[in-house]
Amino acid sequence: MNDLAVSFGGVDARLMARRAIFLPASRTLLVADVHWGKSAAFRAAAIPVPPGTTSDDLERLSKAILETGPARLVILGDLLHAKTWNTKRTHAAVSQWRQRHARLPIVLVRGNHDLRAGDPTPDLDIECVGQPFTLDGLKLCHQPCEHDN
């Protein structure tokens, strides 16, 4: 898996094969559309899907964190898939993952699924904000946001 170095808006970034973007100047790791609990939500709606997708996603995210050593993680929307995300199994996996990365500040820029699913539980210690989230002169959004001309 190869990463790609790019620059946009005067900001250097590393597009990672692990489905993340790393901004080295601010040591920020960006991800989007994590959809924790998606398989649990589908099973709750009687749609057959295998368990374990959240665990796979958490492991990939952990590897990106270990690889980059970020000062913060910013999730650009859709952290949670639906209100039914919070099964015992999913919450236990996410809680254990969060404990592994307890010192890492996490910011969630709410996306369309987050607005329906609600904010993550307080024990996960995730700061939730609306869009846009401004960082290094960039306006970060889940969906296209209005901008100044």
Outline where the language-model segments fall.
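Core catalytic region of metal-dependent phosphoesterases/phosphodiesterases
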Residues: 25, 29-32, 37-132
